[in-house]
Regions:
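Surface-exposed, interaction-prone regions used to assemble/regulate multi-protein complexes
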Residues: 2-145
Length: 145
């Protein structure tokens, strides 16, 4: 009934690299407004025609359920043994209002963004991971000036 045609190959192409990168960018503030999670950055990078530029920017995750936001804050930069805690956005906003989250790695897939990096407080970094779940778009609001 079924004919063996050999192995099936599927190639997953990720297309072109995005114009903007959050790598090494620092989050100044995180807000939740009208079901959108908004990250305000001091700058993000853009790459076009071999030229790197920086821009003041906000990243908006639309239709984000705040109950599904996971923020993991560790006690070190995860080189060996570590401990940490899972906190919610209000606690992050209270405890780390004077801190900056430096994005080192950004990963996106099917309504999920994972930002990993260092949370800087008074010049001292600890590892931090933010798991963001959203059903809308991820929008770059960039000041091109």
């Amino acid at each position: 009934m079924f004919e063996n045609r050999g192995p099936m190959k599927t190639t997953r192409s990720f297309g072109e690299y995005p114009k903007y990168s959050l790598h090494d960018a620092r989050v100044q503030k995180i807000e939740y407004v009208d079901d959108s999670l908004i990250f305000t950055f001091d700058y993000i990078f853009s790459y076009e025609n071999g030229v790197e530029q920086t821009h003041k920017a906000k990243i908006v995750f639309e239709k984000c359920d705040i109950d599904d936001l996971e923020i993991l804050v560790f006690n070190s930069t995860i080189l060996d043994t570590f401990t940490g805690k899972r906190i919610e956005l209000p606690q992050y906003q209270q405890d780390y209002s004077e801190s900056e989250f430096e994005v080192i790695t950004e990963t996106y897939n099917w309504g999920r963004a994972v930002l990993q990096g260092w949370l800087w407080t008074e010049g001292n970094p600890v590892h931090c991971i933010m798991n963001i779940y959203y059903t809308g778009d991820m929008v770059y609001v960039v000041d091109e000036a």
